[in-house]
Design a protein with these regions (language model features):
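Periplasmic-binding protein-like
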Residues: 109, 129, 163-166, 193-198, 204, 273-295, ...
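Early extracytoplasmic/lumenal segment of secretory-pathway proteins
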Residues: 25-91, 364
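Extracytoplasmic ligand-binding site segments that recognize negatively charged/polar headgroups
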Residues: 42, 78-79, 85-205, 209-216
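A bilobed periplasmic-binding-protein/Venus flytrap-type ligand-binding module shared by bacterial periplasmic
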Residues: 134-139, 251-264, 282-283
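A ligand-binding cleft/hinge motif common to bilobed small-molecule-binding domains
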Residues: 88-92, 216, 220-239
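Paired acidic/hydrophobic, glycine-rich loop segments that form the ligand-binding mouth/hinge
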Residues: 79-84, 204, 221-226, 241-242
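C-terminal non-catalytic accessory extensions
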Residues: 344-430
């Protein structure tokens, strides 16, 4: 293809995808890149537009990894703000020098810092969320299910086929929930809970806000979510219930300004708008549904605190491991659990046989990959702007190779457990 044709087609293609290019830049335009869905942000954008007549505000939705990739493109030069609860995204942008320093009054309040990013001079915390369980009260009554109190309850066999959740690869908030469980219970016990909950899943939601939607629609009973999605639905539907789970961490909502060659007055104005008393005092009541940084009522020391440095560093590795252990082998995991439950019921009065079945069950829900393996790989493939394209390709290859190895080990363990169960049942049938 001749270069002049490509030069014409590329901007057109980007424009059609909703991605701004330098040629689109306008003095009275504000472009916000966010990992949140568009709808809850629209009332805030509309109010800002009323205050600043003639300003065109554009919202671009991407997941955290996609946002990093987008901002690394040289032709993407007029994104002004990033709005997200992903510490990985914000830390990556700050460390790569893409963020502008903010005035001190915009920085994270002291009482929220134990749950927030350390690089607060580049990031403003405009609110925070808690997380917990959302459930459909009518569904629970119909299926005679108990009300859950915390995430670990969802590991119980009674919830088999009634649970939904998103995956950390598709949801930054789910990633924080997964890391919270590992931090609270330790690597092995935490993964046992995650694997048992995974085996109880009816489906894995492709979107974090899809969890609350599924449950509100009566498709499933219960799932983990941040409070904002559940609270919005709970205002409209009295059968949608929510409880906070202190096993999860608190999740600040961040906004940061992309460093530009020009002074972007509207980016600063939007951050000031989000920090204003008018927005902060009504933040929980609007569609954004975050707790204000002026509101400490939810905060207590029982919420799990995360070691942000290691959490951010190993995000990609942990996301891959979750998908390999749960998402990609969900049918096999569910079938294995069902077979184990049926065998336990069959031999409930045979203690010696039951003990063997329970040992097989423990194998199914043991994570064969150690935390040290994950952390070591995370260090080896850590993003670095100084790396050449060849070195970056080597890191990607290393992650793929290690992922394949982990997949083989996980599959082998599950197959071995199934085989042992079949042999045991065959022996007892004789």
């Amino acid at each position: 293809m001749p270069r002049w044709i490509f030069a014409f087609i590329l901007p057109c293609l980007l424009l059609s995808l909703g991605v701004p290019t330098q040629a689109q830049a306008a003095e009275r335009e504000l472009v916000i890149l966010t990992t949140f869905s568009r709808e809850p942000l629209l009332p805030l954008v509309e109010e800002f537009s009323r205050r600043y007549q003639g300003i065109e505000v554009q919202i671009i939705h991407r997941r955290a990894q996609s946002s990093v990739q987008l901002l690394n493109k040289s032709y993407i030069q007029n994104i002004d703000l990033v709005l997200s609860s992903s510490p990985y995204l914000m830390q990556n942008l700050a460390q790569s020098g893409k963020l502008a320093a903010l005035p001190e009054p915009m920085q994270t309040p002291e009482w929220l810092k134990p749950y927030a990013l350390p690089m607060t001079e580049y990031v403003a915390t405009i609110g925070y969320s808690g997380a917990g369980l959302v459930w459909n009260q009518d569904y629970l009554k119909t299926h005679q299910l108990p009300e859950p109190k915390q995430f670990s309850d969802l590991a119980k066999p009674v919830y088999f086929g009634h649970v939904t959740m998103s995956t950390p690869a598709r949801s930054g908030t789910t990633q924080m929930m997964v890391e919270s469980i590992l931090a609270k219970y330790g690597w092995q016990k935490g993964w046992e809970i995650l694997l048992r909950v995974g085996a109880n899943l009816a489906t894995a939601s492709a979107r974090s806000f899809g969890v609350s939607d599924y449950i509100a629609n009566g498709q499933f009973a219960v799932g983990p979510t941040i409070d904002s999605y559940a609270l919005i639905l709970g205002r409209k539907l009295d059968y949608v219930q929510f409880v906070y789970d202190e096993s999860f961490t608190l999740m600040p909502t961040y906004v940061a300004q992309i460093r530009q060659n020009h002074n972007d007055q509207y980016a600063k104005a939007f951050i000031e708008f989000l920090m204003s008393s008018a927005v902060q005092t009504n933040m929980e009541g609007n569609d954004f549904a975050k707790h204000s940084v002026q509101d400490q009522s939810l905060v207590n020391e029982r919420f799990t605190r995360l070691p942000m440095g290691s959490i951010i560093r190993r995000e990609e590795c942990l996301n891959d491991l979750f998908d390999l252990a749960i998402t990609k082998q969900l049918p096999q995991l569910k079938d294995t659990l069902l077979a184990v439950l049926e065998a336990k019921a069959q031999f409930a009065r045979r203690p010696s046989v039951l003990a063997k079945i329970e040992q097989i069950e423990r194998t199914v829900f043991t994570m064969p990959i150690t935390e040290q393996e994950v952390d070591t790989l995370a260090i080896q493939i850590a993003p670095n702007s100084a790396l050449s394209e060849e070195q970056q390709a080597e890191s990607a290859m290393l992650l793929a190779e290690k992922g394949h190895e982990w997949q083989m080990r996980l599959e082998k363990q599950l197959e071995q457990a199934n085989q042992e169960l079949k042999i045991l049942l065959a022996e007892e049938a004789q």
